[in-house]
């Protein structure tokens, strides 16, 4: 399986809200960084953040995906969430995924924080 295929499977797990599969894809020492926010280190902390969002629906749409010769995968996405209380969040994102032994060891998502906070208000 290529790292591109791993990322697509990871996104599919998010879309199914299969949190066990999301967790399985992460390295124990993963670094997860939503660039406008604080960096999160470790699988337990990453999963705490992820499940703490409590979405009622997830639909990440991949616009473009590419893998370089080092196996780093870059995604251009629109991450859509149905949030509690009927709120809808649609966030354009550029994401970078790095791998160690087939698991995501670094994940950085770049997005506009104002777009996020305005939709969550």
Question: What kind of region is each of these model predictions?
Answer:
Residues 1-121:
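C-terminal and inter-domain tail/linker signature
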């Amino acid at each position: 399986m290529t790292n591109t295929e791993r990322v697509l499977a990871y996104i599919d797990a998010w879309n199914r809200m299969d949190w066990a599969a999301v967790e399985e894809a992460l390295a124990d020492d993963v670094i997860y960084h939503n660039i406008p926010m604080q960096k999160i280190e470790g699988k337990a902390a990453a999963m705490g953040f992820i499940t703490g969002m409590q979405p009622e629906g997830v639909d990440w749409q991949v616009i473009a995906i590419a893998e370089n010769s080092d196996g780093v995968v870059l995604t251009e996405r629109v991450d859509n969430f149905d949030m509690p209380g009927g709120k809808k969040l649609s966030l354009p994102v550029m994401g970078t995924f790095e791998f160690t032994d087939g698991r995501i060891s670094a994940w950085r998502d770049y997005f506009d924080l104002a777009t996020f906070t305005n939709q969550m208000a």
